[in-house]
UniProtKB/Swiss-Prot annotation:
The lineage of its organism: Eukaryota, Rhodophyta, Bangiophyceae, Bangiales, Bangiaceae. Keywords: Chloroplast, Plastid. Belongs to the ycf20 family. This is Uncharacterized protein ycf20. It comes from the Eukaryota. InterPro entries: Uncharacterised_Ycf20. It comes from Porphyra purpurea (Red seaweed). PANTHER family: PTHR33787, YCF20-LIKE PROTEIN. It is found in: Plastid, Chloroplast. Its main location: plastid. Signal peptide: none annotated. One of its GO terms (cellular component) is chloroplast.
Length: 108
């Protein structure tokens, strides 16, 4: 086969696309696992301190402080962070979402 500029371009494009797609799928999978892990952690965070009754305010203040600290790290600068910071942010989002779902379950 003759190597023309068009065939070289397409072969480079396909290789570049497949490597980016592979990296994106790995990052997406890790992000979803982190999100679901945060949802699972929030279930534990809402049930364990609720059993004793006296840890509710302390646990809530620690959770809010941790969420605000992660938000400050992630959203303070405009530069792109690595995968670990994104996973930490997904974990935070999962915890927040799980706590809202538990609050709606208790309210209904």
């Amino acid at each position: 086969m003759i190597r023309t500029k068009l065939s070289i371009f397409f072969s480079y494009f396909v290789q570049n696309l497949s490597s980016r797609l592979y990296y994106s799928l790995n990052e997406l999978t890790a992000g979803l696992i982190s999100l679901l892990l945060g949802f699972f952690i929030s279930t534990g965070l809402s049930t364990i301190p609720g059993q004793t009754g006296d840890w509710g305010i302390i646990a809530a203040s620690l959770i809010v402080a941790a969420i605000e600290l992660v938000s400050k790290i992630v959203y303070s600068n405009k530069k792109k962070y690595g995968v670990r910071i994104n996973l930490l942010n997904n974990l935070k989002i999962g915890i927040t979402y799980g706590l809202f779902v538990d609050a709606f379950k208790l309210g209904s």
